[in-house]
């Protein structure tokens, strides 16, 4: 009799474990399916916004990067990529080999797009579009975004920076001096700095991880009750930052407010044909929709152990 009772208890425990595992598996499958559906929706929206490949930062390079990295079949067709590359060459030809003297961040993002379509950054119709990123003083003067994307471009494409440590230290100093991780209006600069520094999080000699953790704590305090960071773009950027650190934006406890994750926050800006940037808007916003696609794509890649800003091997 006792053996029978004991056996029944064991069976009950095993069944409970199986149900729990099955329930967890079901939740994961549902989350993965939802992410796939949302990514496909964002791809469709971006293709409507940017039907032709072009060099423009809005509706241009970001669209190309999101479409290529999304993994959605035929998201960025050969023709789309050719149109983008042709536009890059036209711009270089008309401006004596310079993409944009006043906006190095735009140049860096365009270079990422060029690399993703398999072209040589050091020979785009005879022009080297990586030269500017190696000029630390010019990059630094253009602000923290230019420094962040210089680091991203270097790590993603193999472009060697003359003194990488100077870029890293300047970025940390800039974010700390302005306390941008505590200021909602300037938080995007700190968020993108995290993306740039994510490749160096084990660099204890210059306290990268300690600073990133401090910024993450400050940014977490800026998160709103709906899970967002106050705008679609900021929410998307925060998702990309988390995934660049290998963290899951759905389950990361530091960024869950009132049961709402950053993923929930992002979807709160979704409309019938794209994304708005703020809750009061009615018309689809180009930048918000592009950044939403990039964020969703980064989440898909994070589950595969990959970053948004890296070349898949």
List the model feature ranges, each with a label.
Residues 7-28:
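Sec-dependent N-terminal signal peptides of Gram-positive bacterial secreted proteins and lipoproteins
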Residues 1-7:
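N-terminal secretory signal peptides that target proteins for export/translocation
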Residues 2, 26-313:
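Preference for long, amphipathic alpha-helical scaffolds in soluble/luminal domains
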């Amino acid at each position: 009799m006792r053996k029978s009772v004991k056996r029944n208890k064991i069976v009950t425990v095993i069944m409970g474990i199986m149900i729990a595992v099955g329930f967890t598996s079901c939740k994961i499958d549902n989350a993965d399916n939802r992410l796939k559906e949302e990514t496909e929706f964002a791809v469709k929206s971006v293709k409507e916004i940017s039907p032709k490949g072009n060099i423009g930062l809005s509706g241009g390079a970001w669209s190309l990067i999101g479409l290529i990295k999304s993994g959605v079949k035929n998201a960025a067709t050969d023709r789309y990529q050719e149109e983008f590359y042709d536009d890059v060459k036209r711009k270089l030809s008309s401006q004596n080999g310079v993409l944009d003297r006043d906006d190095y961040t735009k140049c860096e993002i365009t270079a990422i797009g060029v690399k993703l379509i398999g072209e040589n950054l050091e020979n785009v119709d005879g022009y080297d579009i990586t030269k500017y990123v190696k000029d630390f003083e010019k990059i630094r003067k253009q602000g923290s975004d230019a420094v962040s994307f210089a680091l991203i471009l270097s790590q993603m494409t193999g472009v060697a920076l003359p003194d990488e440590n100077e870029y890293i230290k300047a970025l940390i100093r800039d974010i700390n001096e302005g306390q941008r991780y505590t200021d909602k209006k300037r938080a995007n600069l700190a968020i993108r700095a995290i993306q740039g520094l994510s490749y160096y999080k084990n660099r204890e000699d210059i306290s990268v991880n300690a600073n990133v953790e401090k910024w993450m704590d400050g940014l977490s305090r800026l998160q709103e009750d709906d899970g967002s960071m106050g705008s679609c773009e900021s929410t998307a950027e925060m998702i990309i930052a988390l995934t660049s650190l290998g963290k899951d934006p759905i389950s990361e406890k530091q960024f869950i407010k009132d049961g709402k994750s950053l993923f929930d926050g992002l979807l709160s800006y979704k409309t019938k044909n794209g994304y708005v940037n703020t809750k009061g808007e009615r018309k689809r916003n180009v930048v918000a929709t592009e950044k939403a696609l990039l964020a969703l794509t980064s989440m898909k890649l994070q589950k595969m152990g990959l970053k948004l800003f890296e070349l898949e091997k």
